[in-house]
Every structure is written in C-alpha cells, then in structure tokens.
Amino acid sequence: MSNGIDKVVLAYSGGLDTSIILKWLQDEYQCEVVAFCADLGQAEELEPARAKAEKFGVKEIYIDDLKEEFVRDFVFPMYRANTLYEGVYHLGTSIARPLIAKRQIEIANATGAQAVSHGATGKGNDQVRFELGYYALRPDIRVIAPWREWDLTSRDKLFAYAEKHGIPVPTDKRGEVPYSMDRNLLHISFEGKALEDPWVEPDEEMFVLSVSPEKAPDQATYVELTFRQGDLVAIDDQEMSPATLLAKLNQLGGRNGIGRLDLVENRYVGMKSRGVYETPGGTILGVAHRAMESLTLDREVAHMKDELMPRYAKLIYNGYWFSPERAMLQTMIDASQTFVNGKVRVKLYKGNVVVVGRQSENSLFDPAIATFEDDKGAYNQADADGFIKLNALRMRIAAMLRNGPKV
C-alpha cells in the first residue's frame, strides 16, 4: 500500500506509540522511513531512540537539538502576549507542535520524502496542530496519520503488536503502563489512567518537575528577572540564552512547588479532557512579564492586549501558529513590547509567585502625580468634576428619558 509514497518523515520519540508506528509504516506502506526526533528539553537521553530506529533498519535518523529555537522563536513570543488558554493553561504542548512540524517539512524537503507522519490520536488536538503546520509550509505534502487508519484501536491490541515485533512496552516503577506524558522545556503534561476521572486527585508520585507546596522550603526565594523588549534576558543580573533562562526558572519554581495545574479543558475536536500540568518556569515568567507591563505599558494598549489574548491563545491551542491572523496579532503584540524593559523582583514561596518590586527606565508610573501626599499642584483634583460629569452624561440622559423629570 505505497500509494506513490517511497519515503516518509516520522516524528519519532522512541516511545511505544511511535516505535509501533515506525514498524507499521514499513509494513503497510512498504516505504523508507526517516526518523526525526526533536530535542525540546525532554531531559531524556535521545540516543536510545537512534538505536531503536536502527534496529528496524532505518538509515536516515535526525536527532536535532531545538531547545534554543523553541524558547526564542515560540515560547518567548507567546509570553509577550501573556498567553493563557481558557485563563489558566500555559500551552506547553500546543506551542511545541509548530516547531516539530516545521522541522519535519524541512527534513522532507532535504530527503525527497513525499509524506510526513505523526503519532497523534484521532481524538486529540495534536493531529490538527501537526497537520495545519504541514499544509501551511508545504501544501502538496502527503500526511499519514496511523491512528486514523489502523485497526490497533485499543491498548491491548497495541501491546500485542509490540510483543509480536519485539518492541518493548515501558512500565513505571510499579510495573504499570505509565501515564500519557508530553514533556519539553516549558512543561510536562499527564493524561489517562486514573486522571480520566475528574474527581480523582493526582498521585503525588506522578509529578516530575516540582515538589508539592506542602513540602517546599519554609524560607522564601527572591529572584530578580530582567526584561528587554518583553523578553527575559537575565536572572539575578546574569544574562543567559533563552533555553538556559527557562531551565533555570524551572529549577527555581520546581523546588518551591510552583506551576502545578489540574484542569478540564475544551479540545478543538469537540470533547472535554482532563489534564494535569507542571509549568514551573513558565508560571514565574508569566507573572513577572505581566508585572513588567503594568509599569511600562500605556493603559489602553494593555487593555487591548488583554482583550485579544484569548483569541491569540485559541489560535495557538487549535494549531494555527502559521496562520495569517496569528502573524497579524504577533506583529501588534511585538510592537507593544518596545518599552517593556526593566526588572521585576518576585518572591517564590510554597506554590506562590508574589511580585514584590518592579523598576524600569521606561516606567510610566509618576510618583509626583500618584502620591497621597502634597503633589505641589501636579494634579488638580477639581478637574475630576468635569471628567466625571461628561462620562456620566449618557447615563443621566437615559435615566431622565426613562424616568421622566422630577416634579
């Protein structure tokens, strides 16, 4: 069943699902498979994935370190918008997919592949995110989505296929099949198993990046974050690369019990799903960036950003990173960050990120006007009388017309 496909680039992790897919592609499509593994900060040794692919005769294997590109070109632009999906989710999975799709298409072009493939299920958002990216970057690309084609429709069938072809089935330290997890430098997500009941509290042993707030230190940690045009550039006055900065924030946040999130979200494909997330560094970054904006952004610009943020977040969540509307919003967001420069001091304590200071050469905060003390005439309080009456005019007119003049 080649269908004119001689070569396919598979987004390959070395895990159970994509290892099964690799073998299935070889058997069903009788084509050459190019294995591509993206290092986005999974904190895993990726060379075993190479060995697994080689075991199945794969000749072209790409293991690419994309951590800096991921944070610089995807995570940081997203955080300039203070992006949260449905008010809480930091989009750690969503924002990784366009970069993987981009690199897959680049490899397909370089190797002469006619198709790309991924391991996303037919029930989830990732199939949409991957494939919208593929088609935006190469309209004629062929897409193979095994979960929408094969008859391996249950875990038991997957395990039987794996056993038949000598593919090891991973287990946790209890000897059980682990949660469905996705990890990168921004977050780790957990789905499936007991979490499919939204009433069940997650097992503490499940968490990877953070201690529980109850077990976090009793002493607060103070951190200073430096921003330049909306992007984090230094921690405690030490400049680092984007990926190194986020990794450092993950360490600081994780040890202080920061960044855990348990939510039921609305998937693009129409169903609700329950996920548990750890985003320690991203949580700190989001709080600090908003604090920096509070000092440096014009009021109406800040409010407009807040109005547009849910739309921007939905575009990323649904897979429209490469769409013209996301690019348009990004241009506006980036323009708003010109003066978002300075420092924010935060206190990290038992799951909380508390802003305790902010300063900027571009500050719009004028203490001479805002003071409760004598402002030496900088602000004439009597001017407020006309301001209030003009703003009340429409409501006064409506009240008079509806209620009639008093006799």
From Swiss-Prot:
Gene Ontology cellular component list: cytoplasm
Annotated positions binding ATP? A11, Y12, S13, G14, G15, L16, D17, T18, S19, A38, G119
User: What compartments host this protein?
Assistant: Cytoplasm
Q: EC number(s) on record?
A: 6.3.4.5
Chain sites annotated for binding L-citrulline = Y89, S94, N125, R129, S180, S189, E265, Y277
Disulfide pairs here are none
Query: Record-annotated residues binding L-aspartate?
Result: T121, N125, D126
UniProt pathway annotation? Amino-acid biosynthesis; L-arginine biosynthesis; L-arginine from L-ornithine and carbamoyl phosphate: step 2/3
Catalyzes what?
Answer: L-citrulline + L-aspartate + ATP = 2-(N(omega)-L-arginino)succinate + AMP + diphosphate + H(+)
Cross-referenced Pfam families, in alphabetical order?
Arginosuc_syn_C, Arginosuc_synth
Q: Which domain of life is it from?
A: Bacteria
Is Nucleotide-binding a UniProt keyword of this protein? yes
Q: Which GO BP terms apply?
A: argininosuccinate metabolic process; L-arginine biosynthetic process; urea cycle
Q: Which GO terms describe its molecular function?
A: argininosuccinate synthase activity; ATP binding
Q: Tell me the keywords, alphabetical order.
A: Amino-acid biosynthesis, Arginine biosynthesis, ATP-binding, Cytoplasm, Ligase, Nucleotide-binding
On assembly, the entry states: Homotetramer.
Sequence similarity:
Belongs to the argininosuccinate synthase family. Type 1 subfamily.
Q: Specify the protein name.
A: Argininosuccinate synthase
**Origin organism of this chain?**
Magnetococcus marinus (strain ATCC BAA-1437 / JCM 17883 / MC-1)
Gene that produces this protein: argG
